[in-house]
Amino acid sequence: MTAQSNITPESIVADLRYLQLLSRSFPTIAAASTEIINLEAILNLPKGTEHFLTDIHGEYEAFQHVLKNASGAVKRKVNEIFGHTLREIEKKELCTLIYYPEEKLQLIKATETDIDDWYLITLNQLVKVCQNVSSKYTRSKVRKSLPAEFSYIIQELLHESTIEPNKHAYINVIISTIISTRRADDFIIAMCNLIQRLTIDSLHIVGDIYDRGPGAHIIMDTLCDYHNFDIQWGNHDILWMGAASGNEACMANVIRLSMRYGNLGTLEDGYGINLLPLATFAMDTYADDPCTIFAPKTNFADSTYNEKTLRLITQMHKAITIIQFKLEANIINRRPEFGMGGRKLLEKIDFERGVFVYEGKEYPLRDTNFPTVDPADPYRLTDEEQELIEKIHYSFMNSEKLKKHMRCLFTYGGMYLVCNSNLLYHASVPLNEDGSFKHVNICGKEYWGKNLLDKIDQLIRTAYFDEDDEEEKRFAMDYIWYLWCGPDAPSFDKDKMATFERYFIADKSLHKETKGYYYALRNKEEICDRILEEFGVTGQHTHIINGHVPVKTIKGEQPMKAGGKLLVIDGGFSKAYQPETGIAGYTLVYHSHGLQLVQHDPFQSTQKAIEEGQDIKSTTFVIEFNSQRMMVKDTDKGKELVTQILDLKKLLVAYRIGLIKEKV
C-alpha cells in the first residue's frame, strides 16, 4: 500500500491547520509537486559519509589533519582519479595542497618558475577531485556548500562535461580567466576547502575534546565553524562545563590537570584565565618547598620551559591540588547523598608523623609539607586560598571565548545520540553484576538506563543555564562534579578516583580504581542488545560506539567487541596514551558501502605535513560491508524526508479537493 493510498479526507481535516501553515512555503500545486520530486530524488542518493572520532584530548594538530584528509579518504580519491597518470610525488603534492591550501601555496610560489602553468594544471586537477567528491550530493546541497564569491563559477566547472570539445574549451576559458585576473590563489583555497567539506558529510565527536593536550580551544574553534557535527559529552568535557557553570572544584581540577601535563595554552591563551594570582600564591606559600612529586610531565607539554618556569608550574600544581581536595570535601559534606564520605582523605593524615592512616594501615607520605592545612580543620580554606579561588572564579565566569565554546557544546552536544542505527555515548551505562541496569538515586528518585542519561543531560543544562531556581541550580552544579568522579556516574563508573593516592602514596595497591560492571559485561552480545533495545535502537545492523577507555592495540586488544555490536574507538589521539595503545587513534567511517575502521599512526606535525608532504599513515579495516549500497532512504534523515513527502502529498490532495486554495 502506498503512502498516497493512506491519505484520507479525515486525515487531511485532522492536519488542516498544519497543512495551512505548510501552504505558505508551497503555495501552489506546482510548488508542492516540485518539492515532492526533489525529496524523492534525494531519497535515492547514496547516504553521506559519517566520521566518528573520540578522545581527542586537546591534540588539535592531529585532529585537524584527520579532518583535512578525511581519515585518508582524500588520498584514496586522488589515487582513484589519477592512478598512474600522475607520479606519486605529484599526488602527494596535490593532497598536501588540498589539506593546507594557504600554506602550500606560499611554498609553491617561492619555488615554482612558471606559476601560471602550475595554476592551469592544478585547477584542472582540483576540478576533477571536486567533481568526484560532489557526485553523491544534489546540486542544491553542493551549492549551499559553496563560497558566495565563487559559487556560480564552481557550479559551471563541476557540472559541465569536459568530453565535448565545445564544453572543454569553455572550461579552459574559465580557468584561464581565473588565472589572468589573479584570482587563482583564492579560487584554489575555495576549491580545497570545498573538497574537505564534501568528503565528510557529518562528524560525530564521541567525547573528550578537553584534557591534557595543548589546544582544546583550537579544536572547539574548528567545531564551532564546522558544517555538520554533534558531540557526546565525555568526562573531561563535563568537567570543563562544570567549571564554566561556576563549580570551583571543577575549576581546580581543570587547572590541576593543565599543570600536571605542562599545558597552559588552553587556559591562558585560549580562554584568558588569569593564572597570575595562583602563581603569586604558590611562590609565597611553597618558596622553600621542592614540590618534587608535582613536577609536570614535560614530555607532553605544549612548550619547552626553562628551569625557573618549571619550578613555578610545579609550585602552582601543588597549590591548586591542595585547594582541590578542600573544595571537593566541602561538596561531599554538603551532599551526603553522594555517598562519597570515604574520599575525604586529608583527615586521615597524621601530620606529625607524616603518614596516611587508611583502614587501620599506615602508609608513609611522599610529601609532608602542608603549610595551608590545619590538622584540626583540614578542609578549611585559608584567607589567601579563599581570595585566590574568588579570583579564579571571576576569571572563568567572565571568559567570553569560554562562554562561546560552552554554548557550542550545549547546542550540539548531549549525553548520548541515536543516529542511523548506532548508539553513541562516551563511557558507560551503569550495570549491576547480573547485567541489569543499575538504579541510581538522584534527589530521592531512581533512574536507570536511558532515563538516567536523560536526567543527567537535564541536570548539566540546569547547572549552566538555570537562573530561576537557586537550590536546583546549586544541586546541579554539585552533581556535575559528581559526574567527574562519582561511582555511579556514567561518565566515570569506577569505585573511586585515586587522585590523592597517586600523588602522595607510593604503594600502588592504593592507586587501583575498579571499573564498574559495564566494562566487563560489554563484551557480551546479549548485554549490548539489551542496551540498544533500552535506547530504542533495533534492527539487524545496530552498534554501540564508545570511547573513554584506550584500546591497547599493542597488546592485541581489538576495538570490536561483542561480536561486532560494540565498537570502542579510543585509539590514543592523546600522546600520553600512545605508549599504551601503540597507535595514534581511530576513525570510524560509515558510508554507503558499510562501516570501516581507520587506524592512524602518530602525526608528526603540521609543519612537516606542509613542507615535506607527510601524511598520517592509516590502515583501513572493513567491519561491515553492505551488499546493496545504502541510500538516504535507509537513514534517519530519509525517514524525516518520507514524512515530509507524505505531508506534501496531503497538501496536494487538500488543494485538489478545495480544502485549501492555491495562492497563485
Swiss-Prot record:
It comes from the Bacteria. Its EC number is 3.1.3.11. Keywords: Carbohydrate metabolism, Hydrolase, Manganese. GO terms for molecular function: fructose 1,6-bisphosphate 1-phosphatase activity. It holds the Pfam family FBPase_2. Transmembrane segments: none annotated. Its cofactor is Mn(2+). Pathway: Carbohydrate biosynthesis; gluconeogenesis. It catalyses: beta-D-fructose 1,6-bisphosphate + H2O = beta-D-fructose 6-phosphate + phosphate. GO terms for biological process: gluconeogenesis. Belongs to the FBPase class 3 family. This is Fructose-1,6-bisphosphatase class 3. It comes from Bacteroides fragilis (strain ATCC 25285 / DSM 2151 / CCUG 4856 / JCM 11019 / LMG 10263 / NCTC 9343 / Onslow / VPI 2553 / EN-2). The lineage of its organism: Bacteria, Pseudomonadati, Bacteroidota, Bacteroidia, Bacteroidales.
